Structure formats: C-alpha cells, structure tokens
Amino acid sequence: MDMSGYRRPGRRLRSTRRLLGILAFALVVVGVGASSAAATKHAGGPATCSGTPGSPGVLSGTYSSNVTIEGVCAAVAGAAVIEGNLTLTPGSGLNAAFAAGSVTVQGNLSVGRGAFMYLGCIPRSFACFDDPNHEHPTLSSASTVEGNLSETQPLGVVVHNSTIGGNVQQTGGGGGTTCENPPPTFPFGVFSDYEDSRIGGSINVIGLNSCWLGLARDSVGRNVHILQDQLADPDAIEIIANQIGNNLVCQQNSMVWNSVETQEGANFPRVPLPNEARHRVGQCVLASPLSEGGPLGPGPF
C-alpha cells in the first residue's frame, strides 16, 4: 500500500485539513468500487472480506451476520451495513475513509493486534482518500458503530466524522515509541486519532506506544482516560476542544497538550483550545504551556 503522497496529521494536527495526496491504494480501490457500486444483500451467515494492499477486498452492501476482515479491505462502493459484529483479524486493515463508501456496524467493532483502520473523513480535519483536492477538500463520509469500538494492540486507528454508540477502548499497540522507519500504511509515523466524532460512552487509551495521538472536537458522553501512553512526537498528545460529559483523566503519559502551535515547524508559541469536562485529574488539570519553558495554567486544560 503506497501512501507516500500523504501527510501525517501528527506533528501538525491542523495539517490534516490539507491531508493526503492521491495514492496508488486509493486509485486501486476506487477502480474496484466503480465496478461493484450496486447495493448487495449478502447471503446469511458470517462473511469474510479479504484482499491484499495491491488488490483490496471491497466491503459493500448489507451483511446479515458478522463480518471478518482478513488482509486489506476498503469501503469504497456505497454503504456497507453489517447487522452483526465487524472484526479485523491480527495484521489486517480497513480503509473506510472514502467519500464513495461508508460503514455501519450494528454490533461491535474489534481491531486486532497489529491491525490498522481508517474510519470516516471530513474536510475540516481529514480529507477523504478519494477527494480530488486535498489542499481544499470538500467531500466527507460518516460511519457508525452502534456498539463498542475495541482495539487490542492495534498498529493505528484513525477515526473522523463517526458515531460510536458505546465505548472506545484502545489497549496497547502503536508500533513503538518512535516516528522512524514507519510502515507503508503510516508513511510519516504511526498514529492513532479520534476527531470530530460522537462517542456515547467513554474513550480509554491505555498503554499506547506510538509516534502521535490526538483527540479533537469529540463529544464524549462519559469519561476520557489517557493512561500510560508514550508518544515520540513532541507535539503529542493533543487533547483539544472536546466536550466530555464527566471526567478527563491523564496519568503517566508523555507530554499532553490542550493547545495547538501557531507556526508551521515549531511547537511554540501555542493557542489554547480547552476542553469541557466536569472534573480533571492528573496531567489534564491545568492548561499546557503556551510558550517554551512557560508554566502550566492558569486556565483549565
């Protein structure tokens, strides 16, 4: 999967708006999708979507039971409705960030060890892979998981413009605390990201070791727990402008920020984008520094 034209939304969170030039993978799956865009009702019983980076499987139509992804698949041919659970097996991948497709999971979505997933896209923060102009994107795609999104030792999970009815639980994974020697699926460093989405329950990211992590402009019904996460990018972990129903808890992490930088290529100066939460605990009590060497606060994180 060649993603060399894409820009990582790590060191500069706002650069996701100018994200991702057209890449070979996108061209392949768009071509596949064009020939299979008609809505399909799949036969009853569990189903499997399988493919390779060079020839991805296409997730499309209505599945009346559970679906398992093996290898690489893409949602690029209209709506994919899964009336059961969706499972990404270890080392597999799902790209559901195309305007030409969407995913609705009526059960739970599980991401296995070493797997990756892109879910949803929106001009504000993450251009769709098939948007013809990534400098000024206009296309979008929204996906829904009615149950929980559970990730166990994933490589990276990137969620935008999506609704998760239950909880988001990311435990471990990330490919190591480094931005060096990234895999083709994350050419500028492995990252996980949750932006411009609605989560009915809580978000818990625990024990992640990666290049970058972000949570931005999410509506979270209950709690956010960011615990024991170590990120290599000095601009991580960014937690900005979220609406959190209960607690925001950050403990034993590398640096956390509730602000964004004002100059490309420099971490300072920064502009605060505080979160709304009933209670703040640990590293997310006082606002992060706005100048190099500056103090925390005085405002809330």
What is each stretch, according to the model?
Residues 46-51, 71, 119, 126, ...:
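Extracellular secreted precursors and ectodomains with disulfide-bonded cysteine-rich loops/domains
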Residues 70, 77, 83, 89, ...:
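Feature marks extracellular polysaccharide-active and adherence modules
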Residues 21-32:
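Bacterial N-terminal signal peptides
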Residues 236-301:
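Leucine-rich solenoid repeat scaffolds
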Residues 1-16:
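N-terminal secretory signal peptides that target proteins for export/translocation
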Residues 93-94, 111-144, 167-194, 210-215, ...:
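Acidic/polar low-complexity surface segments
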Residues 34-36:
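N-terminal signal peptide c-region/cleavage motif recognized by signal peptidases
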Residues 40-93, 295, 299-301:
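N-terminal segments that cap or nucleate solenoid repeat domains
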